[in-house]
From Swiss-Prot:
It comes from the Bacteria. InterPro entries: HflD (IPR007451), HflD-like_sf (IPR035932). PANTHER family: HIGH FREQUENCY LYSOGENIZATION PROTEIN HFLD (PTHR38100:SF1). Keywords: Cell membrane, Cytoplasm, Membrane. HAMAP family: HflD_protein. GO terms for cellular component: cytoplasm; plasma membrane. It is found in: Cytoplasm; Cell membrane. This is High frequency lysogenization protein HflD homolog. The keyword Transcription does not apply. Pfam families: DUF489.
Length: 211
């Protein structure tokens, strides 16, 4: 079913963002391609298709699909798992607040459009990270419910890592918006959990079989 397919990929986008936040917070680095994909997903305001948001290929969400699968099957129940769920829950709270603020949504769309135009002129990923991080601080953080990130103090105090983490939280919230647009909701994670697990396994199987 196409709806379950898109819901599964949206959830993978959420999980990928949250997982990369954890990587940065504890090691100071994360998968560069996955980060770039998450970053550029924020720029896609009017995508031609769902997968266009994530670089036109499901393989760009492979990390998120693996994290989604391990989360729904409880295969790696640990402090890291609890932390991941907490980040996702907090992003969902912020998405609800954002949805209620037409002013914030309007401002975000306009400013993202400008940032996107600038990025596609010079493809400067560092500049894009800085500008999206600043936009997160300016608009999303001002909504309240700031997300407290756990990790190694030296990494958390690094300005560039802070910017990257803000961008990943931003992309996670973007993925939550997509998830809801395709009919996703929290009860679904309980009642349709089996179907989402099955779909995630199927997508991963085809992706790995193709490589």
């Amino acid at each position: 079913m196409k709806k379950i397919h898109l819901i599964t990929l949206s959830l993978a986008g959420i999980c990928q963002s949250a997982h990369l936040v954890q990587q940065l917070a504890y090691s100071g680095k994360c998968d560069s391609n996955a980060f770039s994909i998450c970053l550029k997903s924020i720029l896609e305001i009017n995508p031609t298709s769902f997968i266009a948001i994530y670089g036109n290929h499901e393989k760009n969400l492979i990390i998120g699909l693996e994290i989604l699968l391990s989360t729904l099957t409880f295969s790696s129940f640990s402090y890291s798992y609890i932390e991941l769920i907490k980040y996702i829950s907090n992003m969902m709270i912020i998405e609800k607040k954002l949805k209620k603020s037409r002013t914030a949504i309007y401002s975000l769309k306009n400013k993202i459009s400008v940032i996107s135009s600038e990025y596609y002129l010079n493809y400067n990923i560092k500049n894009l990270t800085r500008k999206l991080g600043e936009l997160y601080l300016e608009i999303i953080s001002s909504l309240g419910s700031r997300i407290v990130i756990k990790g190694i103090k030296d990494f958390l105090q690094d300005h560039q890592i802070q910017e990257k983490i803000r961008c990943l939280l931003f992309s996670g919230i973007r993925a939550i918006v997509l998830w809801k647009q395709y009919g996703g909701n929290q009860l679904q994670l309980i009642y349709f959990r089996y179907f989402i697990i099955k779909k995630a396994k199927k997508i991963l199987y085809h992706l790995k079989d193709a490589t």
